[in-house]
């Protein structure tokens, strides 16, 4: 079981400039002014640190033991305390608190994200599709909402004002579309890392089991049930894609060109 000092040392050792797995948010944010880009990078660093610690542990240990669950849970609660700059002394803690305050980052987004990480620690996969969708609000919609919030901020005399639209409603369809695409695209990679994002009830409906999914990821022939399940997930993703197009038409006229472009880039990357 890792100690808090070990977790902190690992966190500080991560070179966030070299993250290459899923850089879409920061690729798109490069079109912003530097201050907003740095704000996105700070929030992304916070979220990516939590996500990577948990996923890497699962990949290395084929799950999370009860002792490690307690340690991870403690760390997630501790990191949520970073938002109080008065209680934290490290430069990064202060940077995160400053960013949240300066850019009016909605606290619910960070809280929902942390809750999804707690779900990852406590649970092994998803019993139902509804469980996965609820989890996705924290794991995908929350980070996307921060991105949309930063892109939609209105600046007046050096002060940032909230976007002129509902950030969560705007972010949700594109975030869900991209997340479904992500789990379909990365099925084999996730399985090989002991990660499973496909719901048990959907697998059962198509005559699949977790064991069968793992076997196919390791090279066994794909079954008709597997292909049917993937089509079902693609249909769900396509519904979110259609909703995204509607939302984009609504909000794009309210945004400056460079920030509108960044949203379009995120969508097109998927």
Put a short name on every predicted segment.
Residues 1-178, 189-270:
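Catalytic cores of Mg2+-dependent Asp-rich isoprenoid enzymes
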